[in-house]
């Protein structure tokens, strides 16, 4: 009995030693793994062995391929006098431009501004019911700065509802309202940059209501410190050929 008991105690000590070693290994591994993980603002992050933090949920920033002039062969530009200027100075021969002076977002559905080529004039919705486009650009807002914001957005939403129904496969871009010059903004109670900013913010919110409508911040391509530079044009509102090309380049890089 004594010899068996000694063997039993010896085996028991050996077993306890093995268990202790296993627990130690697990503990060391847990510490090492813990050093690779941390919480940042409530989000779990992984620290690679090199020591740089990297979010496990981080998604890459959106990237765009620069499009060439051929992209605009199936594009339509609709808008007011600023859109008309862009169409005139852009040197893009292939896109269709339906824009004219004094056209506003409430008038665009009913105004017959599209020449069919046979002498017949039709509305933009009539044309969209006959011709499919890959992309449609809309530019309104300068002439509507004196309106209540709610009136402007209601009319814009009505037009977007019509276009998205007629062209469900098209990418539709709502172009931001360009700022005016610092001098005009400081002197005019209607055409001023605080009003432009309010309307642009409302347009961004409107675009979020649609799956295939995107807000295109073309203002950032020409504005300097939030205003239209003095050398852009003569009236503080419209722009010249040089700045038309800046806008086109921005579009090519952001669609």
List the predicted regions and their residue ranges.
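Loop/turn elements at helix/coil->beta-strand transitions in domains of secreted/extracellular proteins
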Residues: 71-74, 131-136, 167-172, 210-214
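Active-site segments of SGNH/GDSL-like serine hydrolases
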Residues: 139, 143, 164-196
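Conserved SGNH/GDSL esterase-like catalytic core that processes O-acyl groups on lipids
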Residues: 65-155
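N-terminal Lys/Arg-rich, disordered targeting/topogenic segments
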Residues: 1-13
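Hydrophobic membrane-insertion alpha-helices, especially the h-region
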Residues: 17-31
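Catalytic His-Asp segment of secreted/periplasmic serine-dependent ester chemistry enzymes
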Residues: 31, 180-255
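Charged helix-capping and loop-helix junction motifs
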Residues: 151-159, 193-196
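N-terminal, intrinsically disordered, polar/charged segments of Gram-positive cell-envelope systems
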Residues: 34-74
